[in-house]
């Protein structure tokens, strides 16, 4: 068993499913690190990654600087805990074009990855567009969303410590092939999410692809959406993926109580056990 441990700064969450601090990297002493590792060992759980998903290319320069500074703290914590992995976003200047954002990526990200290399940590970027509703309009908050953009990012930053946290669900609502990129980018896949999404064609037909995505799709537990998990896991085995796979729960139907949240994990685990040992 494993867990992707969230490491947001302490304080009020700025968005849904963010702001959680399983590990306070600001106060991570050697003693606290030893306690965390001992706690995990007692329960038979490994840390797959330390997670912090900010916008490191935020148009607000003060927020950008704070996000980058905290990301570096998460990298240091990953080294201290012997995890060697950080999962995150590259971010995006929401009101700028893809081309402008690639130039911003060229400026911001090589130093971050160089820092990670110095501390023997890999950085895995999730392919979530962070484009859901009016708060993310017009371009979303993460550039790293499609195979075409991945290629261009890897041309700019070919470091072996820079790779992908692959989530098939984000391709579902973009109506893209979520299997083929696994083969093309097999050497860049460092971490994997198991999350599903349900696309509602009748809603899409009414509002169109230019609408806010949450108007025509909904995150679901694995097996309750449109991902073919047999095909997905088959592709992962084809490419020889042997890294961590983490269930990510964002299904609103399983909110409201601690028991419902636990049910979401139990059901996801039970469903995926037919594919994963």
Regions found by a protein language model. Give the residues of each.
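Histidine-acidic metal/acid-base catalytic patches
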Residues: 1-2, 7-11, 41, 82-84, ...
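Extended aliphatic helical segments
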Residues: 3, 20, 25-28, 45, ...
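Glycine-rich, proline-tolerant flexible connector loops at the mouths of alpha/beta enzymes
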Residues: 4-35, 96
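Short histidine/acidic/glycine/proline-rich micro-motifs that form metal-
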Residues: 9, 22-24, 53-58, 92-95, ...
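Short amphipathic alpha-helical segments, especially helix-boundary/capping motifs
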Residues: 9-14, 30, 48-52, 86-89, ...
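Serine/threonine-rich low-complexity intrinsically disordered regions
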Residues: 24, 29, 94-97, 196-200, ...
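Flexible, active-site-adjacent loop/turn segments at secondary-structure boundaries
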Residues: 26, 54-55, 79, 220, ...
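Active-site acidic/histidine proton-transfer and metal-coordination neighborhood
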Residues: 33-49, 55-163, 173-174, 184, ...
């Amino acid at each position: 068993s494993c867990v992707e441990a969230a490491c947001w700064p302490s304080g009020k969450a700025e968005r849904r499913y963010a702001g959680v601090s399983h590990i306070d990297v600001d106060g991570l002493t050697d003693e606290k690190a030893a306690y965390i590792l001992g706690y995990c060992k007692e329960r038979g759980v490994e840390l797959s990654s330390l997670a912090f998903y900010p916008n490191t290319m935020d148009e607000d320069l003060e927020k950008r600087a704070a996000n980058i500074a905290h990301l570096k703290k998460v990298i240091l914590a990953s080294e201290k805990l012997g995890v060697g992995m950080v999962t995150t976003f590259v971010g995006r200047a929401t009101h700028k074009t893809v081309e402008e954002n690639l130039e911003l990526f060229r400026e911001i990200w090589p130093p971050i990855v160089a820092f990670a290399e110095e501390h023997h940590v890999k950085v895995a970027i999730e392919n979530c567009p962070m484009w859901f509703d009016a708060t993310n309009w017009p371009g979303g908050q993460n550039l790293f969303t499609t195979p075409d953009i991945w290629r261009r990012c890897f041309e700019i930053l070919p470091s072996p410590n820079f790779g992908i946290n692959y989530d098939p669900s984000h391709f579902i609502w973009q109506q893209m092939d979520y299997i083929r990129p696994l083969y093309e980018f097999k050497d860049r896949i460092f971490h994997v999410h198991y999350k599903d999404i349900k696309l509602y064609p009748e809603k899409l037909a009414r509002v169109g692809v230019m609408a806010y995505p949450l108007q025509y799709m909904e995150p679901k537990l694995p097996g309750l959406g449109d991902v073919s998990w047999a095909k997905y896991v088959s592709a992962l085995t084809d490419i020889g993926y042997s890294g961590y796979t983490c269930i990510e729960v964002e299904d609103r139907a399983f909110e409201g109580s601690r028991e419902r949240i636990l049910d979401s994990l139990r059901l996801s685990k039970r469903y995926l056990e037919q594919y994963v040992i």
